[in-house]
């Protein structure tokens, strides 16, 4: 870039016409291309959030009101979602009641479907993702999840929702959210 500027100032005179202007533009474009290529090849590592040991009792509970097939479907969904590394708690809610709790359990046995966060997610049928749950005022809406959960996702499906808790902030990638969405949709189909 410095050579192009020096060439323009000293060698081209006060007014550069035609060929000189085109050559200068090509030189600037080539230089910018090299700079952008170099920047695109820089290996940048994102800093992972600190993993937190979730406080709560470990366990699994399936509602006794479910049929054998529905209980099997609920266990399948929880197992599929728990394959995501950072997911430590899965809570399934369907037809007005909590049908499964698995992993590190929160203090409340039931999903509070009347809380603003859950009722909004169920009404609008759009996932609600809180990547930094400790910074969210609606933290109290997640009593069914461990108190020190770092991230949470509510994924609605027809008649219910899946709620998950993670052990670090910003833990769920778009791919993880898509996987939970597919599992929730299939669970909704099986339970209906």
What does each of the following model-derived ranges do?
Residues 75-90, 119-124, 143, 186, ...:
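Amphipathic alpha-helical regulatory segments at dimerization interfaces
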Residues 97-153:
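Regulatory sensory and allosteric helical modules in signal-transduction proteins
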């Amino acid at each position: 870039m410095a050579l192009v500027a020096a060439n323009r100032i000293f060698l081209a005179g006060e007014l550069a016409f035609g060929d000189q202007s085109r050559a200068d533009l090509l030189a600037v474009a080539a230089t910018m291309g090299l700079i952008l290529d170099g920047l695109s090849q820089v290996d940048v590592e994102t800093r992972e959030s600190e993993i937190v040991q979730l406080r709560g009792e470990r366990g699994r509970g399936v509602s006794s009101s479910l049929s054998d097939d529905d209980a099997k479907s609920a266990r399948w969904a929880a197992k599929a979602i728990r394959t995501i590394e950072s997911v430590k708690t899965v809570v399934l809610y369907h037809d007005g009641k909590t049908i499964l709790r698995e992993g590190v359990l929160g203090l409340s046995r039931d999903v509070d479907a009347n809380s603003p966060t859950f009722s909004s997610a169920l009404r609008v049928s759009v996932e609600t993702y809180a990547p930094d749950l400790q910074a969210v005022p609606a933290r109290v809406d997640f009593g069914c999840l461990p108190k020190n959960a770092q991230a949470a996702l509510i994924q609605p499906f027809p008649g219910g929702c899946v709620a998950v808790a993670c052990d670090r902030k910003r833990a769920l990638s778009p791919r993880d959210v898509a996987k939970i969405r597919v599992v929730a949709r299939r669970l909704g189909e099986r339970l209906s």
